[in-house]
């Protein structure tokens, strides 16, 4: 009887530990747009307003050297971010709507850096230079040589700088391993001279790091052992160059990987890399990350002739490409041929699907049916790139010139605050308990109630 009691107590303790550990993991912000790239952290107690000039509700501010549009990531009390530093590349960003596809004409020596800060104080804990040299690929005027967001967990920090390599550090900044993939041609597929730099962020799940490399030649999806860097699998993809980050979803307990694409949008087995389903069509420059809902995966894209938004079943198998004129089939719950965003990852929040377009138009949709809840324009801002995030009924959306719109999660557009940061902002914010972090061209701000 005593042994049985000990056994039962042990099982209860084990379950409570695992539940606590899982909850802890879900409240971290470990990759682009947080846990599973969802962009949501409720019960964070964030302020409704702040002022970067007076310091109202600004907990701290620090200058980030160089240029980067990598979002901050957070694990426990540490915040991590990357940048590419050059003494000669002073072009900065070119905000606004324009059709110029030419890259920035700069061939100066850069240093690719990873920074670790105390999230509470802004104190720099460590800094590492991953590599140094002339970039192998030039950058778009809205881009940098440090576009990809880090992936972190309680032990490791993974940085992917495209043609400059994949790097894994421990959380104290000691290099564990690195990999060189050679030249990854992140270019406009119809104009090879239009080099735009790499931007697909790595994803950590379990014991593996996942990377999606949709490039001009030899596109692939691959998994590497997080501890050693050993290749676990590598799957070829027939795809144009793209800049989208993969995401993790589950189908009846099976862990899968969702990837956006034009010729080969699809799902893959996490363990083997085997393709589970595929679908062609959409915007021919794919950038937004898939968003995971309840038994559905949401995709959007925009460029060329099509700009769809669609909801795909997590149980999809085989080729599920829609025939001409179709908007649904056995695995496509619903789709819209127009309205998808070129740059923005959508936000699924409180049973509403938010799609922000480059000009600041918001489409709020019913995630189950795709029916419009509302469409509205955010203020007078001309251009948006940073994807939205949400907490406690508030949605935070920065425009390119650094104005932050805080709107209510309501059945119609309700603007709570409009806050100028007076500096270009191309980066999705990051949220932790009591704080939200904004990266501008030069600075990183920690915003909290004071």
Tell me what each language-model feature is.
Residues 1-24:
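Bacterial Sec-dependent N-terminal signal peptides
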